[in-house]
């Protein structure tokens, strides 16, 4: 009778790019000693589409439909950053109503993104039921998006100087009803999940990041705020009209997967607070800055030849980016989404560098999973919240 020998050498396992609980097409090459993770190497690039290069031969308006394909679960933020850059370059004022509409759309999008983080995260840990609950609420948000923008996802709604269309009749009441309903939904999630002993066993003390470490790795968003750093670009940069609302930055000091879960859950309730204030205080007026449509290069333009620049419905196709560079950023659900924009007196950007939050937050993964168990990889990766569309661009 032969005695089976115990393997002493290390085992290398490929997780992904088509692993059932892998988020998109990420591939992890994991070195294991039994159940213990010795090393982990993320391999990216399976969803690379050359988004930065595409931007260099498109006008801003032509490029707007492309940007919704970076983080395709929080598309309003990619649109916001795409129009904020040219607005700051051209010093374009956004009407108050348009700014309020933008805030409403951004916060709805933040809730939708956090919901679609929560469901798969719970499924990764082994709780299948919340996965179906979150679609119930998310569907309501998409209904609101559809009635306002015409699209459930990939809205293509923001424009330079405002938004594409005003809110339809009755939309604000419908959205307020959703806010009231959703608060009960979040309470239900907290009752169901937060004190669940099995859930706590899986996430408490797993993947701890200290405050200084988080800053050194360049983390942002819930990853940074869960490590005790109170940093939210909505408070720091004062963009749109967030200063007019009463809300708090949500943060935790533990820095583990549970803290990141708690930050995102409480961010959803803060978003509802902002939404309710914005919906109740939304001013009248135009939803778009009409001046943008008349960006004329020649000041003494003769009116005898037909020039469609002056009568176009949308911001003029000949909108020029002045010869300067600019970094703009917004607080996306996953972290700081930024764009480094270089103009050179042409309608196309000379350089359009994307700073995706998911890509930078993902860099800390190998360090977090070392000396953990194999099953913890999914917990830690889930708590980081990545979307491969923006990681690979």
Curated annotation (Swiss-Prot):
InterPro entries of this UniProt entry? Answer: NADH_Q_OxRdtase_suD, NADH_UbQ_OxRdtase_49kDa_CS, NDH1_su_D/H, NiFe-Hase_large
Q: How does it sit in the membrane?
A: Peripheral membrane protein
The protein's matches in Pfam families, at most eight in alphabetical order, are given as:
Complex1_49kDa
Q: Where in the cell is it found?
A: Plastid, Chloroplast thylakoid membrane
GO molecular function annotations of the record: NAD binding; oxidoreductase activity, acting on NAD(P)H, quinone or similar compound as acceptor; quinone binding
Q: Which EC class, in a word?
A: translocase
Q: Which UniProt keywords apply?
A: Chloroplast, Membrane, NAD, NADP, Plastid, Plastoquinone, Quinone, Thylakoid, Translocase, Transport
Query: Which cellular component terms (GO) are annotated to the entry?
Result: chloroplast thylakoid membrane
HAMAP family (UniProt xref): NDH1_NuoD
Q: Family, per the entry?
A: Belongs to the complex I 49 kDa subunit family.
Name the chain's protein: NAD(P)H-quinone oxidoreductase subunit H, chloroplastic
* Gene this chain is encoded by: ndhH
